Amino acid sequence: MSKVTPQPKIGFVSLGCPKNLVDSERILTELRTEGYDVVPSYDDADMVIVNTCGFIDSAVQESLEAIGEALNENGKVIVTGCLGAKEDQIREVHPKVLEITGPHSYEQVLEHVHHYVPKPKHNPFLSLVPEQGVKLTPRHYAYLKISEGCNHRCTFCIIPSMRGDLVSRPIGEVLSEAKRLVDAGVKEILVISQDTSAYGVDVKHRTGFHNGEPVKTSMVSLCEQLSKLGIWTRLHYVYPYPHVDDVIPLMAEGKILPYLDIPLQHASPRILKLMKRPGSVDRQLARIKQWRKICPELTLRSTFIVGFPGETEEDFQMLLDFLKEARLDRVGCFKYSPVEGADANALPDQVPEEVKEERWNRFMQLQQQISAERLQEKVGREILVIIDEVDEEGAIGRSMADAPEIDGAVYLNGETNVKPGDILRVKVEHADEYDLWGSRV
């Protein structure tokens, strides 16, 4: 009787943004396909992979701590991801790391795993890997990454130095993945990249093929095709190019969710110029007004930076005035912090930490009031809600206006006879600055 060789076991730590999560899913899918077992503890693992984030200082620190914990608990560690692009920085703190690769280096990661933990010779588990691959999100939603890298050179950002220039995935490949996800039960697809609106720019929007039909490689064409799948499609990381205007009618027609995540970063033309971002606030306000005219249900999410080098009280007041005028639904705000390798570090007139803190508090106080007023307008209305969690007290879901992890929730007390992924019609009964409460219609 032949002896059964135990499956080699790999531990995995995934840090950072949804784009990094997709990279982790791809590596895990390859490992499972090759017959490796992925285990949840360091003790049982033959080796640990840490997929790092390196965007801001706190993320670097979290990544270094995760690497240290994996080394202490296991000893055999491979590092990949954004921080992996800075090998010297990792080796200085953790010289015992076996191998280090940068982001989206899937083949290199697998080669390193093969070197230290050889592939199993017999793989009876191949058929157990689902066609859509290993997913780290709940079954009813998934991230769909359409490109890698970015062509912009914002002075506060080092992503291009880590992930390179824009490389768009073939549109046929993207749409085939989307179809596999829907076939596997996904009800909501979240389109992500470093710059979603630039999709196809690097290949001059060439025509690709899906199911034998020609399809242009562009954000608008992608949205048109995804709308045929009969699921919720949500756009993230949309740089404010002029052609973003073209997706608003698709939202008004119900083809994709009326939700736009569009990072604006500031409202002072002078600060935007220092950031190397587009700088016409009046034009942006006019666009927002026009978008809402075309699609009254539109939810706008954005992110901003306060305390950027050179930001005066006058610049900051322009930002507050913009918030009052734009009345955005969902807003994230970050206090500027120097990122190693960013051009903004060399700018004069760095803003003191106490001023950053004070401005951040004023920003958040104003935006919370605006967000609360925007949500209060929904009380008494009926909305669609996708269920995320159910327990003995009721269900928690999200409206079309809420992306997972970053936006609010809809609480349905006592609604226990539903399951994650169900989409319900709900009457809104109460709201605060972030969340809604309601009951099933």
From Swiss-Prot:
GO molecular function: 4 iron, 4 sulfur cluster binding; aspartic acid methylthiotransferase activity; metal ion binding; protein methylthiotransferase activity
Pfam families named among the record's database cross-references: Radical_SAM, TRAM_2, UPF0004
Record field: catalytic activity: L-aspartate(89)-[ribosomal protein uS12]-hydrogen + (sulfur carrier)-SH + AH2 + 2 S-adenosyl-L-methionine = 3-methylsulfanyl-L-aspartate(89)-[ribosomal protein uS12]-hydrogen + (sulfur carrier)-H + 5'-deoxyadenosine + L-methionine + A + S-adenosyl-L-homocysteine + 2 H(+)
A Gene Ontology BP annotation from the UniProt entry: tRNA modification
Recorded GO CC terms: cytosol
E.C. designation(s): 2.8.4.4
CC cofactor: [4Fe-4S] cluster
Purpose of the protein: Catalyzes the methylthiolation of an aspartic acid residue of ribosomal protein uS12.
Official protein name in the record: Ribosomal protein uS12 methylthiotransferase RimO
Provenance organism: Escherichia coli O1:K1 / APEC
